[in-house]
């Protein structure tokens, strides 16, 4: 379970798997800040019976076949560690079906062991439920913060993925209440849908293309800067990154426009 530090880590891994599957619609369901249930449902390509079972084996991945593939990775994940890590520390139920198949496969795993696998009737795509996270690692479970803090981490992780993929319809339920319902849109509309309608007037589009890199996105107008960090997102090839170097570069561009102890949004 070393890859999974908290419920938000599992949310990231599962949602990225859905993106890699070519999903156009992803649903995230959370109960008790992810301690009781983390469920992700997508309409992606689904898995074969064998791939579904293999996905829980360590370093088993369908995303690379040869060493050369390592230098041309376009998928979010490729090491094959996360699913195996989750299987070791939670109760897992997976249903997956490929479009051309009449039946899908249904797997139940407990403590890293496959308890059951059978054919099932289910929708195209994949539904995976992570239940009772860290049930067999009490020290790790006790290390988790309050439900409020863990939920905040989950929402932040969800927001990063949603911002990077405006072309995918994504929704999120917290304890049976719909918290986000984001239809397919462009980047600007996705930002507004996540951060609130008032943010639309704050946004300034930027675009730069060079032989080395293409840069596009939005920055916030100086008058809307804040005393606190947050609302700062860098994505490289649709992956969220944290970079002190890049953050300082942006902050330097704002010098003279905002007070030293304030932070711009981007």
Feature locations, PLM:
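N-terminal phosphate-binding caps/lids of nucleotide- and nucleic-acid-binding domains
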Residues: 2-266
């Amino acid at each position: 379970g070393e890859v999974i530090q908290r419920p938000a880590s599992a949310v990231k891994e599962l949602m990225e798997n859905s993106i890699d599957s070519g999903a156009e619609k992803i649903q995230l369901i959370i109960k008790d800040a992810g301690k009781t249930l983390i469920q992700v449902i997508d309409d992606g390509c689904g898995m074969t019976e064998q791939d579904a079972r293999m996905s829980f084996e360590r370093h088993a991945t369908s995303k690379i076949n040869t060493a050369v593939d390592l230098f041309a990775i376009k998928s979010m994940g490729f090491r094959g560690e996360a699913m195996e890590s989750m299987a070791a520390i939670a109760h897992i139920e997976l249903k997956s079906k490929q479009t051309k198949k009449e039946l899908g496969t249904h797997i139940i795993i407990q403590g890293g062991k496959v308890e059951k696998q059978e054919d099932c009737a289910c929708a195209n795509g994949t539904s995976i439920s992570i239940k009772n996270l860290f049930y067999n690692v009490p020290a790790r479970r006790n290390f988790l913060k309050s439900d409020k803090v863990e939920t905040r981490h989950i929402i932040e992780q969800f927001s990063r993925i949603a911002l990077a993929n405006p072309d995918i319809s994504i929704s999120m339920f917290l304890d049976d209440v719909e918290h986000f319902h984001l239809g397919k849109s462009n980047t600007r509309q996705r930002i507004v849908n996540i951060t609130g309608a008032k943010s639309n007037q704050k946004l300034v589009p930027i675009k730069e293309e060079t032989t080395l890199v293409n840069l596009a996105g939005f920055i916030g107008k100086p008058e809307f800067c804040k005393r606190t960090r947050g609302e700062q997102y860098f994505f490289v090839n649709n992956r969220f990154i944290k970079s002190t170097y890049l953050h300082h570069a942006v902050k330097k561009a704002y010098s003279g426009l905002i007070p030293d102890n304030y932070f711009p949004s981007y």
